[in-house]
Amino acid sequence: MDGPERDFNLKVVLISFKKCLTDKGEVLLDHYTASWKGLVRFLNSLGAVFSFISKDVVSKLQIMEHLRSGPQSEHYISLQSMVAYEVSNKLVDRDSRSRPRHPNSGCRTVLRLHRALHWLQLFLEGLRTSSEDARTSTLCSEAYNATLAAYHSWIVRQAVNVAFHALPPRKVFLEAMNMGSSEQAVEMLGEALPFIEQVYDISQKLYAEHSLLDLP
């Protein structure tokens, strides 16, 4: 990522998800990927503990940027237009028993980002609503087990949960968001997290309508 990781403001990153949505409730993919880049900077600022997520996210963002700059870029302006295009042209692999024909489809790629966004949303919400003496590692593990864990092998799940024990105390973690005191960070999360939640909910509904939530 360009520039030092500490030179970002998490509130700006979270509120940037507001730009993802049009008045019609469409999710604009350029803003979606830009917002995710900001989240990657946040994850990287916390050290190697989240590298297993941030590295995967970066690879998915590269796929989406390739699709946005490719010959069919007009179909990848919004999440809705992408889903309509790939589903109607059978560019989505639905059967896990068959050899993948479209491993880098936009639908599959965004689904991975969508799942990771849910984990981060739940984790940050847990930080916001928890008591001062809450263990960051426990909050992170609970969010992970409720979201991404279902898609990882047993070995990966064990390694991830061990890594979470290296997370700093809640107060230190909140102050790492560059929003002043931990109290100010909590207030900021209350203002900014609804934007992520709205993007997540719209994406979840769209994928459910097209039976895309369990793509292999």
Curated annotation (Swiss-Prot):
Transmembrane regions listed in the UniProt entry: none
Domain of life per record: Eukaryota
Gene Ontology BP terms: ceramide 1-phosphate transport; ceramide transport; intermembrane lipid transfer; negative regulation of autophagy; negative regulation of interleukin-1 beta production; negative regulation of NLRP3 inflammasome complex assembly
Amino-acid positions noted as binding an N-acylsphingoid base 1-phosphate in the UniProt annotation, renumbered to this chain: D56, K60, R108, R112, H152
Any GO MF annotation of the entry: ceramide 1-phosphate binding
Family: Belongs to the GLTP family.
Membrane topology: Peripheral membrane protein
Keywords for this protein: Cell membrane, Cytoplasm, Endosome, Golgi apparatus, Lipid transport, Lipid-binding, Membrane, Nucleus, Transport
GO cellular component: cytosol; endosome membrane; Golgi apparatus; nuclear outer membrane; plasma membrane
UniProt organism field: Rattus norvegicus (Rat)
UniProt protein name: Ceramide-1-phosphate transfer protein
Pfam families reported in the protein's UniProt record: GLTP
Main subcellular location: cytoplasm
UniProt function note: Mediates the intracellular transfer of ceramide-1-phosphate (C1P) between organelle membranes and the cell membrane. Required for normal structure of the Golgi stacks. Can bind phosphoceramides with a variety of aliphatic chains, but has a preference for lipids with saturated C16:0 or monounsaturated C18:1 aliphatic chains, and is inefficient with phosphoceramides containing lignoceryl (C24:0). Plays a role in the regulation of the cellular levels of ceramide-1-phosphate, and thereby contributes to the regulation of phospholipase PLA2G4A activity and the release of arachidonic acid.
Entries under PANTHER family matching the protein: CERAMIDE-1-PHOSPHATE TRANSFER PROTEIN, GLYCOLIPID TRANSFER PROTEIN-RELATED
